Amino acid sequence: MKKSKRKNAQAQEAQETEVLVQEEAEELPEFPEGEPDPDLEDPDLALEDDLLDLPEEGEGLDLEEEEEDLPIPKISTSDPVRQYLHEIGQVPLLTLEEEVELARKVEEGMEAIKKLSEITGLDPDLIREVVRAKILGSARVRHIPGLKETLDPKTVEEIDQKLKSLPKEHKRYLHIAREGEAARQHLIEANLRLVVSIAKKYTGRGLSFLDLIQEGNQGLIRAVEKFEYKRRFKFSTYATWWIRQAINRAIADQARTIRIPVHMVETINKLSRTARQLQQELGREPTYEEIAEAMGPGWDAKRVEETLKIAQEPVSLETPIGDEKDSFYGDFIPDEHLPSPVDAATQSLLSEELEKALSKLSEREAMVLKLRKGLIDGREHTLEEVGAFFGVTRERIRQIENKALRKLKYHESRTRKLRDFLD
């Protein structure tokens, strides 16, 4: 009882923390997300890896003027989550020119890392991690979910010293690489509230709010690395797709107890959209055949039914049932292998009538019939097996069996009741 109360208290505390975090996120200034994508806003739509429909050159969306400077409440620094939300709210937004300049430095930094790799023979990813670790060491936001890369401090120091010992003419590449990583970090930090504003729309779909933020941050990092600043569009317009894609994929991979492959999630979502559209057109629930016809070639009623079964959410057998919560879902699931009361009663009566019918036979004759017809263990034994049991030949068992059957046929009054069970 004490353990149950403790678990309930812990669950309630976790739920209250989640609510507080979301309330804190609601108080952050809204980040301009650029043009909304209705396909990605619908939680039932599929994940699609199509290329982002980018605006034409010079069409960069300047949405920062629409943002209101909402006050950020004072918070206790003892709560790291609320502290994180508070800190990202303090980072000023970037203008289009600032985004272009930072993105240019990021690109130059990546080129410099390639040059350093050619000069030193070190792996470019390793050089990038070392430079990044140095930058993150002095970052303003040090506990950003999903952004804190881990690397052995000793290894970092050794590689850093090797880079510092480069000839003077090559050190400029190290300087450019550090500037590029600093610009990358700045571009990420300035857009973290965009992740929070998008993550708020995906709560209640199987992942906690903090998990959604972490997955969204991964999408933001990807967007920074893929951003094409020369096309002159707002970074938020570009990053929104990557953030949503990362969150949607995480929900598809992690939200269910039994994971469903992403391609199957896409199929399920397409099927759900088709079913809803048919329901609106027909004014009733569509049949499997109608859904299959609307889905197109390769679909039939059986495939529709099987796909919908895959989409079903599992339910715990320990789910409480009723207002009193004193019974569980598993208590109401019948055992399909257990015979029904009627079948059990019929079987009992049949056994009694069989015993009465066999009572006119000798003990050996009755046992031979029981073994041959599977009345003892449910398996019909061969003549050889029964002969081995009695220590006689199979021919002798055949004779005993025929004699016993003739006796039963002679006593027809005894076997008449058995025929009723066949009806």
From Swiss-Prot:
Assigned GO CC terms: cytoplasm
InterPro entries documented for this protein: RNA_pol_sigma-70_dom, RNA_pol_sigma70, RNA_pol_sigma70_r1_2, RNA_pol_sigma70_r2, RNA_pol_sigma70_r3, RNA_pol_sigma70_r4, RNA_pol_sigma_r2, RNA_pol_sigma_r3/r4-like
Region (Sigma-70 factor domain-3): 266-344
CDD domains per UniProt: Sigma70_r4 (cd06171)
Bias type Acidic residues, positions: 21-70
Region (Sigma-70 factor domain-2): 187-257
Location of region: Disordered: 1-76
Matching NCBIfam families: RpoD_Cterm, sigma70-ECF
Protein name according to UniProt: RNA polymerase sigma factor SigA
